[in-house]
């Protein structure tokens, strides 16, 4: 008996994350990509823009009703913030059974949506068909802070540096290589959306200062944590090892991880664990690829989880 593949479509596929999603879907034995929506690339063959895809599918320019009419089993929205609502409304009205995964910030504060950071939230998944993917910076911050969450004596201070792919493909200062050359560009130094996201998810205030760097992909998150009681470096290291012992995408390392080593890989490295005198302050460093674990890989984990498959299918 032949098992029918699960059909999937992507809305907003021109961006860097869309390209990574196409590669992961092409590698998935149980998924069939049935539409890819992009106004800018409409009419062009997907295979010309994605190394991993070999079919004849072409990009289409689809509005919300047209996406709903495709009746795909799964739809991933890879749109800029603020653009998801019409597509969600159309799918809610016409295909409520569709599994919908939104990569924007639009539904991360909506309690009706499952917030999908599997290493921290998979135990709360209860069959929701609406999944909000966490932000890239927010993923790094939460994974770096959580093992010491109950020991915090004050707000974590998080200094984040991202490659310019995190600024998307729409031209701006933050993804202009000429402006970024020999430069580090701070922005949104208070009240960044990922600061609010992490504060809400962890239930503690978090202070976040993002920066864009000249490299293309990868995030370095340096987190300063004040502790209620002194802990040794060995105790802290052991807490992280224990918390993530069964998480194959999270590697605890001794030295501070380098972003150059994580770019293009699916997981997260956490390390550095440097104590201040008195052992009530520790600095932890996390690195991840913003396009993969910060976006596409995490979406695939959430998809696999929701459909009852091995969480790492197509991820490796």
UniProtKB/Swiss-Prot annotation:
Its EC number is 1.2.1.38. PANTHER family: N-ACETYL-GAMMA-GLUTAMYL-PHOSPHATE REDUCTASE, CHLOROPLASTIC-RELATED, N-ACETYL-GAMMA-GLUTAMYL-PHOSPHATE REDUCTASE, CHLOROPLASTIC-RELATED-RELATED. This is N-acetyl-gamma-glutamyl-phosphate reductase. Gene3D superfamilies: Dihydrodipicolinate Reductase, domain 2 (3.30.360.10), NAD(P)-binding Rossmann-like Domain (3.40.50.720). It is found in: Cytoplasm. Belongs to the NAGSA dehydrogenase family. Type 1 subfamily. InterPro entries: AGPR_AS (IPR023013), AGPR_type-1 (IPR000706), NAD(P)-bd_dom_sf (IPR036291), NAGSA_dehydrogenase (IPR050085), Semialdehyde_DH_NAD-bd (IPR000534). One of its GO terms (cellular component) is cytoplasm. GO terms for molecular function: N-acetyl-gamma-glutamyl-phosphate reductase activity; NAD binding; NADP+ binding. The gene is argC. PROSITE patterns: ARGC. Pathway: Amino-acid biosynthesis; L-arginine biosynthesis; N(2)-acetyl-L-ornithine from L-glutamate: step 3/4. It comes from Xanthomonas campestris pv. campestris (strain 8004).
């Amino acid at each position: 008996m032949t098992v029918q593949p699960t059909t999937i479509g992507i809305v907003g596929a021109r961006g860097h994350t869309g390209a990574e999603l196409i590669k992961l879907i092409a590698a998935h034995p149980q998924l069939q990509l049935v539409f890819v929506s992009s106004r800018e690339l409409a009419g062009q063959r997907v295979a010309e823009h994605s190394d991993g895809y070999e079919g004849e599918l072409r990009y289409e320019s689809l509005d919300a009703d047209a996406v709903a009419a495709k009746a795909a089993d799964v739809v991933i929205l890879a749109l800029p913030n603020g653009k998801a609502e019409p597509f969600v409304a159309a799918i809610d009205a016409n295909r409520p059974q569709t599994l919908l995964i939104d990569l924007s910030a639009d539904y991360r504060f909506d309690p009706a949506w499952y917030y999908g950071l599997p290493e921290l939230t998979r135990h709360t998944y209860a069959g929701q068909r609406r999944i909000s993917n966490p932000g890239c910076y927010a993923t790094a911050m939460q994974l770096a802070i959580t093992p010491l969450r109950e020991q915090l004596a004050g707000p974590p201070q998080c200094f984040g540096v991202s490659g310019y792919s995190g600024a998307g493909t729409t031209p701006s200062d933050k993804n202009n290589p000429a402006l970024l050359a020999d430069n580090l560009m701070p922005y949104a130094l208070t009240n960044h959306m990922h600061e609010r996201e992490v504060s809400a998810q962890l239930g503690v205030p978090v202070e976040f200062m993002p920066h864009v760097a000249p490299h293309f992909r990868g995030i370095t998150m340096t987190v300063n944590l004040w502790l209620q009681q002194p802990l040794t470096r060995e105790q802290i290291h052991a807490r992280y090892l224990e918390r993530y012992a069964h998480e194959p995408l999270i590697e605890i390392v001794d030295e501070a991880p380098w972003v150059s080593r994580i770019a293009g890989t699916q997981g997260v490295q956490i390390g550095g664990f440097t104590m201040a005198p008195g052992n009530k302050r520790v600095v932890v460093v996390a690195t991840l690829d913003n396009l993969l674990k910060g976006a596409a890989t995490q979406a695939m984990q959430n998809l696999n989880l929701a459909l009852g498959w091995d969480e790492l299918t197509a991820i490796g």
